Amino acid sequence: MTLEWFYATFVEMWSHTFMVRGFAVTILAASVCALLSCWLVLVGWSLMGDALSHAVVPGIVLAYIVGLPFSVGAFIAAIVCVALIAVVRNGSGLKEDTVMGVVFTTMLALGLVLISVFPSHIHLQHVIFGDLLGITQADLWQVVVLAPLAAVIVIVKRKDLTLFAFDPIHASAIGLSTKRLSALLLICLAMTVVVAMQAVGAILIVALLIIPGATAFC
């Protein structure tokens, strides 16, 4: 192991802009996912993160078709997914995990159909596994805005969210709106999914959203 090897392996790569962008997005995505993961595990919403990560695929495709930033389409698709889960769950009487499975697989299938019908530069592999080295300056700014925003919201409301996670009945009894806290947590989850999509894609988001909280819980 020589000094030249060390420089070429660990130092020279930072001279490339795409490496710096990829590293920055990875750090931001991993940090906000780990922060949110604790509440997701406590509330029992681990599958919700998986559902949203798959459900954003049609939003990404539609955003490209109409010329919007991918993050806008992904965020809207995530909110639509949450709304559909609530509507189907309340209207059918099915358990929440069953409804999640139905909704997110349907939206993922819709996204794959849209990719096939509207050929574009969107590669399915990049949607599923991310495109870390292809992150643009615009993508970086989207992550820089959304990741701290989600983190700040969770930190500011951490006491209310923790009480909601441990004892929603007590939270409601002392005047907290459990519906609003639930909606707030879902919005933060949607923003976090959009951030992580840039780095790891739809498949691996669930690992960033579950493993940190599960590790802390143990």
State where each predicted segment sits.
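Membrane-helix/interface signature in polytopic inner-membrane proteins
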Residues: 152-185
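Transmembrane alpha-helical segments in multi-pass inner-membrane proteins
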Residues: 203-218
